[in-house]
From Swiss-Prot:
Species classification: Eukaryota, Metazoa, Spiralia, Lophotrochozoa, Platyhelminthes
Entry-linked Pfam families: 14-3-3
SMART domains on file: 14_3_3
CDD domains, A to Z: 14-3-3
Protein name as annotated: 14-3-3 protein homolog 1
UniProt similarity note: Belongs to the 14-3-3 family.
Species of provenance: Echinococcus granulosus
Length: 244
């Protein structure tokens, strides 16, 4: 199984931050995640820059495996019953194991579980991260393991949503990103398109009324996520109307 390269504990946090940035520029995301993982072990709480580096690193690392899994899963289905079926199943299992290990690595980081000491925005950020990585696990799991990951993902997203609705503006990119990912969870994992549409539409409609008040530094991120919400609603709309 592939393992992420980790840095030594003798590296300072500043050195690890710089190493993560360098790895990001080189698009070496396994190296970036290794630096961020070591950094997270050295800190009780990450600042915004460190948390964002951690998020970007693992998003790309797990994203590559999710893409591989989808490709291999499609190939395995087409090859079912052929002489190559067993070989494809073995390779698919290897990708699944890598993906789940990465998710477990994230969920085992010292910044999770979430403590009362950190601020509301950080709590929302980490609960959202928990929800995402439990969802990624559920995508490839079956049976009891799938049920456990699905339940954990929903619980983390619900906690993040309750906090976000109380603490963040409707145009805040973290709140919008949470709504985007939670709606995808309902659509893809829970197979509840009507719930997914309702959540995505509520987030988009609330944000569009306040679009003129978005701060300059978050305008690009917020409007991009709003566009993704609208794209999903367009894609899901026929199913939502059928289920209504």
């Amino acid at each position: 199984m592939s393992r992420l390269a980790e840095c030594t504990i003798s590296d300072t946090v500043d050195e690890l931050v710089q190493r993560a940035k360098l790895a990001e520029q080189a698009e070496r995301y396994d190296d970036m995640a290794g630096a961020c993982k070591t950094m997270a072990k050295m800190r009780n709480e990450l600042n915004n820059e460190e948390a964002n580096l951690l998020s970007v690193a693992y998003k790309n690392v797990v994203g590559a495996r999710r893409s591989s899994w989808r490709i291999m899963s499609s190939i395995a289905k087409k090859q079912a019953g052929t002489p190559l079926a067993h070989q494809h199943d073995i390779y698919l299992k290897k990708v699944e194991e890598e993906l789940i290990q990465i998710c477990n690595d994230v969920l085992a980081l010292p910044v999770l579980p979430i403590t009362e000491k950190i601020g509301a925005e950080a709590k929302i950020f980490y609960y959202k991260m928990m929800g995402d990585y439990y969802r990624y696990s559920a995508e490839v799991q079956e049976g009891e393991q799938n049920d456990k990951s699905t339940e954990a993902a929903e619980e983390a997203n619900q906690k993040a949503t309750s906090l976000a609705e109380a603490e963040l503006s409707v145009t805040h990119p973290i709140r919008l990103g949470l709504a985007l990912n939670f709606s995808v969870f309902y659509y893809e994992i829970k197979n509840m398109p009507e719930k997914a549409c309702s959540l995505a539409k509520a987030a988009f409609d609330a944000a569009i009324t306040e679009v003129d008040s978005i701060k300059d530094e978050t305008y690009k991120d917020s409007t991009l996520i709003m566009q993704l919400l609208r794209d999903n609603l367009t894609l899901w709309n026929s199913e939502c109307e059928t289920d209504s």
